[in-house]
């Protein structure tokens, strides 16, 4: 299909690209999802959890910002090495066009942040004709606006998008490099049922060496600039390149999978909200886990579980500053514990629980009619006891890899451990956030054991005062024995999903050796892995080399619908196999290598992952997803160590 057929502003039946045919750029405040066609298909503004301005991937009426060749072209997308600057190239017989997308990042501390989406278009061979379309749809396409076009100078145009509420005003700057390139902006008001408030289009012909920059910004946000010069754009691009290259140079991983690990680390960095140090699960919302299905969630918040794993991964790679910032965020969360002494499972990026209520946007069709489209997340009301394990593991790694924790944080840790001791027997919703009945999920019990184990390690290593250390030790051991006694199905030979569902297999138990709960070569665990690796049709969880969380046809989680294989647990299996492989089972190491290499091929063309993957290799769910990149990094790290032990190349 020609690109211009896909991106017409009047296309009521617009067909978005596949989820994995997008790149992402960001500035640690927000991000933009950009398709291989050169279209901004999702962007929330000015923060990750703000309402969307562009969200056409969910509905043709939800706004877009496209820069697309008019001729039939082939296209390729890549990041500039060691940066999060996205290159999209369009190739035709007439010429080659390059589209450069980035958000500015200041390199020097004294530089201000220009919170702009910058899109630079240049013709690098021959001639190219392009079409610009900018049609915002404010507040998830719920608020109308007025579009105005101004001619600032002979060759400088500016479009303004003024919300019905009057504030804030959004600006599109058109900045040509040189006077030879002539531009014009045409004001368009399509039918009301598409984009209420209109937008702008422009047709341009670029010759070799010509360049034009389009900048989307908000009036009053960032430095005050009346109009943008090409020289300023050059400086912002150079500063952004320097920032990303300096950041990734801190990475201490130098193993076999260096490029893969660094790209996923760069992706994780984009998911950090810089003002607070919070880490979001994903910058997108309501991308489906099953095409046409109902499993469509909003992940633009900071889950304690996801963010703790993220900081664990970044700290292991040598990125200490992010761990320090996150620990500051966590300390403030712990200072505001609930009345019962616990904490919430999810917070806003600002550290509170506001604007998290789940709402269905019934006016949006959803990605390929996958509805409802949801914002907010009802999981905020869940009890998910496993979060205390992930939290304590991240604090333990922080204390070990970054800097010793402060005494005031230790006091908060003690209170958390007391809460764990008092509540570990309660059923919960656990890691999969089921919307059915609460259970005594094994994953939660394992992570509650981790919480007490890591706290005890910190106490003994640092000689920190621990008045209830005997209670913690006794409870830790009691949890362990409960898991081994009630969580293992002796007849079928696997660790089960929960104490109640003792005959149901769940891939979350693969975490056991990863958190040092059990030896990777313990017969019970090896038998569990064997069962998980059986085909779905033979009561296992594997299909086409991919692992499902659990069998939806056997276990009803209260959500309904189907889903794809879960990327994170696929990598957990690689880790577990590699650990067993270097502990006396070399064939399992070979299996781990083969599976890892297959999983690398399941990544997007930019080497990051969505939450899930279909059996036909399509990405499903929100993308990029922190969980998936974290697990990919950890698997590469463990596999590299295991291969080094066996001196394999």
UniProtKB/Swiss-Prot annotation:
<keyword id="KW-1133">Transmembrane helix</keyword>
<dbReference type="GO" id="GO:0016020">
    <property type="term" value="C:membrane"/>
</dbReference>
<dbReference type="InterPro" id="IPR008928">
    <property type="entry name" value="6-hairpin_glycosidase_sf"/>
</dbReference>
<dbReference type="GO" id="GO:0004553">
    <property type="term" value="F:hydrolase activity, hydrolyzing O-glycosyl compounds"/>
</dbReference>
<feature type="transmembrane region" description="Helical">
    <location>
        <begin position="626"/>
        <end position="646"/>
    </location>
</feature>
<dbReference type="GO" id="GO:0005829">
    <property type="term" value="C:cytosol"/>
</dbReference>
<keyword id="KW-0472">Membrane</keyword>
<dbReference type="Pfam" id="PF19291">
    <property type="entry name" value="TREH_N"/>
</dbReference>
<protein>
    <recommendedName>
        <fullName>Uncharacterized protein C4H3.03c</fullName>
    </recommendedName>
</protein>
<dbReference type="GO" id="GO:0005975">
    <property type="term" value="P:carbohydrate metabolic process"/>
</dbReference>
<keyword id="KW-0812">Transmembrane</keyword>
<dbReference type="Pfam" id="PF00723">
    <property type="entry name" value="Glyco_hydro_15"/>
</dbReference>
<dbReference type="InterPro" id="IPR012341">
    <property type="entry name" value="6hp_glycosidase-like_sf"/>
</dbReference>
<dbReference type="InterPro" id="IPR011613">
    <property type="entry name" value="GH15-like"/>
</dbReference>
<feature type="transmembrane region" description="Helical">
    <location>
        <begin position="564"/>
        <end position="584"/>
    </location>
</feature>
<dbReference type="InterPro" id="IPR045582">
    <property type="entry name" value="Trehalase-like_N"/>
</dbReference>
<feature type="transmembrane region" description="Helical">
    <location>
        <begin position="265"/>
        <end position="285"/>
    </location>
</feature>
<dbReference type="GO" id="GO:0005634">
    <property type="term" value="C:nucleus"/>
</dbReference>
